[in-house]
Amino acid sequence: MTHSHNLLGEPPATLLPGIPAADAALAAGTDPAEVAAAHPTASAAWAALAEGALDGGRTIEAYAYARTGYHRGLDALRRNGWKGYGPVPWSHEPNRGFLRCVTVLAQAAERIGETDEHDRCTQLLRDCDPSLAA
């Protein structure tokens, strides 16, 4: 017998805790490089660095920043119960740093011809939050 749906259902959404000091520093306009140095686990700081580099045409730099934030985010997700699948909603502010890193990683990968990585990142975004599929 074949079933076309998951009988166990979808796992609960993973909601990362914020990093208040890093979040406050970024909100106050502190240079994201300073924030990343002081709070290296803060994906939001890495996302800001990656976005700035990508906007400035520095694709390899953007790729490196985004990959760092992506890995820091994966570590945080796992520490908070994520098993490699399930919702990571954009609507929860502390999740956005990780999701922004995945977005920039996909864009930078596409620019350097890493089609497989672009596709994996795009699928991860869809899996984390279907509203990010566009």
Regions found by a protein language model. Name each.
Residues M1-G84, V102, Q107-A134:
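N-terminal alpha-helical interaction modules that lie
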Residues S43, H92-N95, L99:
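Start-of-helix signal in alpha-solenoid helical-repeat scaffolds, especially tetratricopeptide repeats
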Residues E34-A37, P89-P94:
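Solvent-exposed loop and edge beta-strand segments that line ligand/cofactor-binding
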